Amino acid sequence: MSPVIWLLLAGTMLLYVFMRWQTHLAESGREPLIDPRLFRNRQLTGGLTMFFAQFTVQAGVFFTVPLFLSVVLELSALQTGIRLIPLSIALLVAAAGIPKLWPRANPRRVVRWGLASMTIGILVLVAGLDPGANAGIVAVPMLLMGLGLGALASQLGAVTVSAVPDSQSAEVGGLQNTATNLGASLGTALIGSVLIATLSATIVAGIQSNPDVPAATKEQASTELASGVPFLSDSQLRVALNEASVSESTAQEIVDLNADARLEALRVALALAALLGLTALFFTGNIPRQAPAAQVPENP
């Protein structure tokens, strides 16, 4: 059995023991590191859930889009960063503009619009991933992603902080950081695993079904690729095939197959990110409809 399973079980058990001990401390009148009673606060748990969902989706997109730009299109790091600028600009505009222009906006509605914008942006990108796609296809999706992330950023911090008294703000800050870090870690791991699994399955299946690939190459590929296929650019793959003394015709077949498999893997991984964003919409019920008092400016 994979050691990952045992680590997950051990982590779950450790978390259970930790929470039981924190509950014991709270019930005995001592000060716990985290008061378990905080999780009975619907507004707080709603905000933390949205932070977790946001960073899960965000991390998955930030993992896959640079792969498309830097590996599939073989852009430099600088060129890749330039293509992501629309996201940064839109995020800044939305995060700063929404509280200023609509200080009494319904937080739940803003969060839902933010998640919807992120999801639509991802789906637009999925639809544009075809063999002839260029770097320009990421502009609109990144703009929509940025608007969505900015909308969430404009609301979630105030939602969580205003859910508890000032005396517990430090605990809430710790929980918020935990939710974001956990979401980012899980998003990268989940989306990355799905991407590599899809890439591996597609390439192996394509090699096995291709009559132009020699039987010896098929057998070697099945053995060597069983543990996963690296996400390689065309030039990287050609170098590896040349070093392996693969014939030019067979090498071209494999390069073409890898190109198709990369796009399929990216589409599946991004589709999963979109599904996670869509699912998060069903967990926004605990976000309040009224703006927290701290967000609403007092009348002069």
PLM ranges: what are they?
Residues 19, 23-28, 100-104, 130-134, ...:
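Transmembrane helix-loop junctions in multipass membrane proteins, especially transporters and channels
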Residues 51-58, 177-184, 264:
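Membrane-embedded alpha-helical bundles that form the substrate/pore pathway
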Residues 8-20:
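Hydrophobic core of alpha-helical transmembrane segments in multi-pass integral membrane proteins
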Residues 12-15, 92, 119-120, 126, ...:
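Small-residue-rich packing faces within the transmembrane alpha-helices of Major Facilitator Superfamily
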Residues 1, 22-24, 38, 43, ...:
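Transmembrane-helix exit segments and adjacent C-terminal regions of multi-pass membrane proteins
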Residues 3-6, 27-171, 187:
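Transmembrane core module of solute transporters
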Residues 61, 67, 138-226, 285:
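Small-residue-rich alpha-helical segments with characteristic i,i+4
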Residues 1-4, 65-83, 124-138, 198-211, ...:
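Membrane interfacial helix motifs at helix-loop boundaries and amphipathic/re-entrant anchors
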